Amino acid sequence: KGYLYWGDSPWCAKVESEDAAKCTLFPASRLVTDSKRELLESLTAAEKAMVRSVFLTQPLPENAAGATLLLPRSFVEDGLMTQAEQNAMFKAVAAKYTAGPLFIKTHPRDTTDYHALFPDAVILERTMPSEVLNFCLPFKFARAVTVQSFVLRAFTAADEKILLSLEEAQALLN
């Protein structure tokens, strides 16, 4: 019969959703609420440390008070600018919005050398899902900043979330 995606297979008895009441793709009788958020929030400190150890290749700084998280994406890979233009733009974004220690969570497709661009920043592994930041770090960021990305929509690990358009970020270069 060909490829049947998601819960469309006749052999699929139920479809799990974070919140079945908000899902409109399937009838309510086929849906089950299974909140991963609640599961992750219920982890003990030791369990969270174990999850961190999977993704972190270096220890976290002792003091992360007032930390800013920059979540860049690759505009170079998307053909929207050169590497030099992207580097300059993210340096300008970081200069304007960083307060306290700077953490950078790179996008999996982004091959930029953020260690070279921001030698004092804590660079989180590109293989770490950004969702892990919501529950596994022992602190909350004061601010999270991204450019033309939806990554902050479900992000809960920052007191302030700043979503810049590409035009707003590029304007910081002037």
State what each model feature region is:
Residues 98-126:
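Catalytic donor nucleotide-activated moiety binding site of glycosyltransferases and closely related
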Residues 82-96:
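Well-ordered, non-membrane alpha-helical segments in soluble/globular domains
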Residues 131-173:
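A donor-sugar binding/catalytic signature common to diverse glycosyltransferases
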Residues 65-77, 106-109, 149, 166-167:
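Short loop/turn segments at strand-loop or loop-helix junctions that form parts
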Residues 1-67:
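A nucleotide-sugar donor-handling region in carbohydrate enzymes
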Residues 39, 43, 72-84:
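Surface-exposed cleft-lining segments at the edges of enzyme active sites
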